[in-house]
């Protein structure tokens, strides 16, 4: 849905483009929002500001038009709120995964060593990857990286939590600390963004991938390129080519 005008956030309904409504998950976020809060929705530039908070809906003003779709991330720009690190849906998913003998888990939006401690206690015999994608994770980086073995930098969400021009610095900082602490860091998001609609990468993308490997990343993650892109196979093939060149000249 192309959003150009005012919208309402509703507590209990899903996207209703005909009545300018959408909802957010988890539902408890609704109660934390207040007047003048600034929200960045997804990665298509949509920005909205809370105008008025009612008991079951929030009226918002669109400050920058953009695309609204299902399952998009929402970032509160102007302040921080404290939510449970696992939702009811997360806990149910973990229960199902354990019953089906799943041994690998990733914790999104890891904010502190306390989050890692709780997750380790919940899943003592599984491999766990902790995602670094918030400003609080950057603030608590040393204590977080002292508590785990495997981490993943999500550059997309981190760029919304901080600013995009800081991402190269944060990436290098995390990878440098990882070498020192002898832990693994994987890097994700926007490696081959141009290949969403083009069979060939740009020189800038090639350099980004190679530099990330040189700096010590233990793995690279393709997301939208293979999930919804038009050239998923070509993306994987190109990534393998660069990794081969890196290993050859390492």
Question: What do the predicted segments below correspond to?
Answer:
Residues 1-250:
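Non-catalytic helical/linker scaffolds that mediate oligomerization, partner binding
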């Amino acid at each position: 849905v192309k959003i150009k005008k005012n919208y309402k956030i509703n507590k209990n309904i899903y996207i209703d483009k005909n009545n300018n409504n959408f909802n957010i998950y988890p539902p408890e976020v609704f109660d934390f929002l207040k007047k003048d809060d600034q929200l960045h929705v997804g990665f298509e530039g949509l920005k909205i500001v809370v105008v008025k908070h009612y008991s079951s809906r929030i009226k918002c003003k669109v400050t920058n038009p953009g695309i609204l779709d299902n399952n998009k991330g929402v970032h509160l720009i102007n302040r921080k709120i404290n939510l449970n690190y696992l939702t009811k849906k997360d806990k149910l998913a973990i229960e199902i995964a354990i019953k089906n003998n799943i041994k690998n888990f990733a914790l999104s939006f890891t904010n502190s060593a306390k989050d890692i401690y709780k997750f380790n206690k919940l899943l003592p015999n599984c491999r766990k990857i902790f995602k670094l994608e918030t400003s609080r994770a950057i603030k608590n980086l040393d204590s977080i990286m002292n508590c785990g073995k495997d981490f993943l930098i999500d550059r997309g969400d981190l760029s919304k939590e901080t600013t995009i021009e800081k991402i190269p610095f944060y990436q290098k900082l995390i990878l440098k600390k990882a070498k020192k602490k002898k832990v693994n860091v994987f890097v994700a998001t926007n490696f081959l963004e141009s290949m969403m609609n083009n069979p060939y990468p740009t020189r800038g993308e090639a350099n980004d991938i190679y530099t990330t490997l040189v700096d010590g990343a233990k793995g690279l993650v393709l997301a939208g390129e293979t999930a919804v892109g038009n050239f998923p196979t070509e993306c994987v093939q190109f990534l393998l080519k660069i990794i081969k060149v890196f290993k050859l000249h390492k």
